[in-house]
Each structure stands twice: as structure tokens, then as C-alpha cells.
Amino acid sequence: MSDSSVREKNDNFRGYRKRGRQELRKIKRSSARTEGGSTETLEDVAEDIDHRSDEDEVSDVDSGDDFDIEDEEGKKEKVYDALLTILKSEHPEPKRRRREADESNKAPAEVGEDEHENTEHGPVDDQLEIENGLLGNHEDDNDDDSSEDEKDIDSEDEQDPFESHFNQVPEKFVDELSNAFKTKSVKYKSVKGSLSDSESYIYAKPVVIGEEALVESPYRSSSIYSYFLKQRLKVQNGLLDKKTDPLTALQKKLVDPMFQYKDILYEYDSYEKDEDEYRDLYALHVLNHIYKTRDRILKNNQRLQDNPDTEHLDQGFTRPKVLIVVPTREVAYRVVDKIISKSGIDQVDKKGKFYDQFRDDSLPPKSKPKSFQHIFRGNTNDFFVVGLKFTRKAIKLYSNFYQSDIIVCSPLGIQMILENTDKKKRQDDFLSSIELMVIDQLHSIEYQNISHIFTIFDHLNKIPDQQHEADFSRIRMWYINEQAKLFRQTMVFTKYISPAANSLINGRCRNMAGRWKNHKIIGSENSSIGQSGLKIRQIFQRFDIIGNSIIEEPDYRFKFFTSVIIPGIVKSTGYEDGILIYIPDYTDFIRIRNYMKEKTTILFGDINEYSSQRQLNANRSLFQQGRLKVMLYTERLHHYRRYEIKGVKSVVFYKPPNNPEFYNEVVRFIGKNAFLGNTDLNISTVRCIYSKLDGLSLERIVGTKRAAVLSHAQKEIYEFK
């Protein structure tokens, strides 16, 4: 089918009304609006809810420096009523804590004994959160396009990855690869390399089965100067002198795969330093992409004025091009502040409001581990969605989603929009044209609700239900053909790579440019066991999975636990009390608790992320006194609380903790009890059950080489001391 026939077919696709170039060029910009006051109203909120509104241009189609085509005549009254209905039906009462909006996201910090940990940015209910996250922008933008510096217009050099990735790929190749993914006739060809003595990488690219393809390392010169940055960014970030090397060692690892639009899964070391460095780099990359996208459209606008008969495909269905997902408002504040500082734009609308709602200088207690202090500092609210709109002269925060270039959100915040219980009120069209996605601090997000991340992927790059003033004559064919996922770059940054992280990058990403992952090589001296400092028996017991079925792994683990570990507790030759069973997954916890209630006579208690404060205090006290022999303890509760459990004499890890810090923290419960003279380290034991599928966690606990032996050797029991 020819391009013209496809385009003709799609003119009325899903009820779209084609809006051609001639019609667009006749639309005149409305006069600037004035704000009646500083107080935001529900009519303001309605601007973001109404994706049919003519108030703001919401697609890439813009004539003018920020490509807005605005219309004074919005549908405010209708939207206002609809919004009131939404708020009243879904939020009948203000809730005391934000996490109670979704029980699956309820953090134990809500019910903790340390009030400082629980403190959020004021008592905010769900309705107020929606207002904060979905505020519209009423300002008109009359910046002069003619002020654009001609030297900063893209040269459209074919060596520019922006050009080669989005504009130069043959349509035939895209069709073949798309069909190959649908028919599962794709394989990944990979190349491996070394980054340092303790770190390697693997780069894999999708190839149609049966076709020959050469896969080369993505590394060029590991220099930012190899890429075509906009002049404004060079000036703002001190990148004019090529004789200087502005990149850190971490940034040199990432700059080539990142600026070549490859998917990235990066495991970093330092909470503070590394996070700051990779954010510096991806903020620059995001801004470069936004600026190039805008300038390409402006250049083509001029070309169409000179020659209306030419065709220029440079847009998607809607305007938003970048989605950044972060766990808390504190992280969102740091990311947005980084983007603002690197943008080269001085005017930032509603910056003060953003700082008031996202910035918080409060710190957790210094008695908590450093990692806890880092993750839970500042504003830990996890319910927000904020749009950023870039014009020639300003950055507008809290912009309408369809009017935004970048959307910064938490998983829970965007989940409440994408998965509204009322199907008629659901919205996801603003995610139809996302070309860059960033997931920052995935290790923290996993303890909120990782399923929300998978939900976001389900809604990315779909054909929108509404037109949103899209000009089909300028929409790229791979958008119309539902092939945008092949072009989207996804970047995931995490402190610890997990099976969930691998599942996201391997199973939900189809970037034709391939995917890049790093791998940390952990020496035994840097492992959890190597750094514990306790001379205590640590026993690792492997159970085998018939057929290596991931789906059946929980059943095999449970069977091994009930047939081997539980009888060992009943007939223990060691301590009969003070046994702590550490369980990472809540569903496993429920299963074990029910089994011990119904099938055993063991006197046990439990504390988990949904326990009331009364239950937490009572069971911890009874366990310390020895009146409860066994305590079930969940990883999510430990993540949010970092309790010091007293009275622990032995530990059983139902599964290796994904965070190696947790392993040592729990083992030290025994050490602290021994220091008080309540237990003997020669009698106490630490027991961890694992399978081959726990390789990632094992590496961090025992070291890379030892983990390989534990996973694949014939011997099933290993002991360290």
C-alpha cells in the first residue's frame, strides 16, 4: 500500500477529522490572556482533564515558537461539571494519608513509631493531589519566532543520531522488524565489552531471524562532542571548548548508548554522586531532543510556506515527547531543577509554586542507615503528575498534559489517570507519542508497586482515541502504523538490577537501536558476607526447579520451605526461640503465615507493611521476651522502617534480599543480641534458601564468582563463616 493510500485511509481513522496545512496556516493566535488572580480554581484543573479542549494546542502541530494554536472558546463549563463528578465520585472524603489512596501502595511509614520518617509535605488528601498534579496553564505565548538564531537550526546531518534514528530509517526495514516482533521471529545479536576491571556491558540489537546483521559496539569516543548538541545547550553548559573534557567516568560509560537512542539499564554505585552525574547527562539528552523536535517543526513550517506542495513528516499524534517516572516529589524536584538549570532558559513560570509543593529540607533520623536517609529525605509524597512546556523564552510548569513537552510523574500518580475505574474517564492519549522514557530510582519504585510501571508500558505509544488537533499530513508513518515502540528510547536507572528491571528492558522495550546493560563484577571482599564482620554460620541451601519454570518457582520454593525448613525449626538443635523469618514478597508472606497457622503448632507472630502500630509494638515486644518463638518479617516493612528487631538468635531468609544492605542489617540483629549477652554466635545460624533464578541477588550477597558456584555446582548446601 502506498503512503498516499495509507494516509487517505487514515484521514478518518477512529473518527479523526483531517486538519490540513492550509487550514492550520489560517488560524490566528489569540491575544494574550491575563490571570484574574493567583488562586487556582477547579476550572484551572479542568484544563488538564479535558483532552478535547480547544483552549491549548496539544499536538506537535504548531506555527509559532512554541507551536501553540490556542482558542479562547474552551469547553470550560462542561469540563468543570465533569471534573466535579470525578472528584466527588472518586474522593468522597479527604484521606489522612496519601498512600491510603491505593492499599497496594500503602507504605509502612504511615503507621510507624518514628514520626519523623512519616512526615510528608503537609497533610495532603487525594483531591488536593489531583489538583496539584493536573493544573492547567492559561497563558498565551506570543514569542517571536523570527528571533530564532539561524546558527542553531539543525543541519540535518545524517550522522546526527536524532536524524538517523527518527528520520532516515527505511520504511521497509521498519515494516519487516515490526512484523517480526508480531510473529516472534526476532532474535537479539549481542556484543560484550569491558568498562573496567569490575564492570562490563552487553549491547544487544534486534534482528529478523534469517537475516545477516553486524552488531558493533556502541562506543565511539565516549565524548559529548561527538553528538550534535543545540548551540543554546553548549553555551549554557560550558561545552564550546572541545579541548576540555567535561564528562565524568560514569558519564563516559553512558554518553554513547544514550545519545545514540539505545535503551539503557544502568546499575550505579553511589546514591548521591552517581545519581547526580547520570541525571546531568540525561537532562542534557532530553533537552536536546525537545529542542531538535521543535526546531525541525519550525523549519518545516517555513518550507511549507515557501512550497505548500511538499510533504514533511515530523510529528506524532500529540505533543508530549518525554516521560520521566520517579518515586517521590523529592526526586522530581531534583530532576526538574536539573532540567531548568541546563535549559538555557531564564524565565520559569510557577517555579515558586513548584518549589513550595515539591521541595522539603527535612531529613530522616541520623540513627537510620545512610541509604535510608537518602531515599526518604525531603518530600516523600508519591502522588503527582507535572507537565513541562518549553517555549522560546520560558519554561511553563504545571502545563496541560497535551500542551507539555515533558511529563514528570510518580507511578501512582499516572496510574490514577490511566486506570480510572470509570472507563469513560480514563486518559492515555497524552502518552501516544512518547519518544524518550526515563525511569529513575527503579529500586525505590519496586517497593511502592512495580505493577504500576508495567501499566504505564501498556499505555505507551498507542493510537489515540481522540484527534487532539493532529495534522495527519505531517504525522510520521511509523506512528500511524503503530510502530512507535520501535523508535522509543527507554532508560532505566537503579541501584540494584532485579528480575523486574530485566523484565522491563527485555520484555517491554522493542527499540530497533537495541539495548545496553552494564554488569557489576562483585568481589567476595565487597559482598555482603565479606563486609558483615560477624563470625557466624551462614548456610545457603539451593532448591531445584524442574524445567526452570519461572512461573512455578514460587511453588517449588514454598514446597522446599515447608518440607525442609519448617521441620528443621521444629526439631532444631540450636535455639528454639528468637527465630526471624525474613520474607521479601508479600504474597509469599501470606502463604507462609496461613500454612503456619493451619499446619503447625509453632508459636509465632508477624509484622508486615499493613500491620497496625499496636500490632507492630505488641509482636516485637513478645518476640523480644521469647513468648513468640518465631517472627515473620517482610522486606517492604524493613525498607520503609529499618526496624531494629530485638531478641533475634537465628535468621531464615525465605529468599535472598534484592538489596544487599538488608542482608547485613538483618544478620546484625543477631550480633547486637550477642553483644547484650543474650545469644551465642557459635550456636546462632543464618540460613538462606535460593534457586538458580536468584543469581542477581546472590552476586551481591556472596560475590560474583561464588554466586556462579552456588547456582550451578552439584552441591546444594554451602556454608560461610
From Swiss-Prot:
Predominant localisation class: nucleus
Matches recorded under Pfam families: Utp25_C, UTP25_NTPase-like
Residue spans of biased composition, Basic and acidic residues class: 1-14, 88-105
Entry-linked InterPro entries: P-loop_NTPase, UTP25, UTP25_C, UTP25_NTPase-like
Keywords attached to this entry: Nucleus, Phosphoprotein, Ribonucleoprotein, Ribosome biogenesis, rRNA processing
Compositional bias (Basic residues): 15-31
Domain of life assignment: Eukaryota
Gene3D superfamilies the UniProt entry points to: P-loop containing nucleotide triphosphate hydrolases (3.40.50.300)
Record keyword Repeat present: no
Biased composition (Acidic residues): 55-72, 140-161
Spans annotated as Disordered: 1-168
Subcellular locations according to the entry: Nucleus, Nucleolus
One BP annotation, GO: maturation of SSU-rRNA from tricistronic rRNA transcript (SSU-rRNA, 5.8S rRNA, LSU-rRNA)
CC terms in the record's Gene Ontology section: nucleolus; small-subunit processome
Keyword Manganese annotated: no
GO molecular function list: rRNA binding; U3 snoRNA binding
Residues carrying Phosphoserine: S53, S63, S196
Subunit details: Interacts with snoRNA U3. Interacts with MPP10, RRp9, UTP8 and UTP18. Component of the ribosomal small subunit (SSU) processome composed of at least 40 protein subunits and snoRNA U3.
Family that this chain belongs to: Belongs to the UTP25 family.
Role noted for this protein: DEAD-box RNA helicase-like protein required for pre-18S rRNA processing, specifically at sites A0, A1, and A2.
Protein name as catalogued: U3 small nucleolar RNA-associated protein 25
Annotated organism of origin: Saccharomyces cerevisiae (strain YJM789)
Lineage, top ranks: Eukaryota, Fungi, Dikarya, Ascomycota, Saccharomycotina
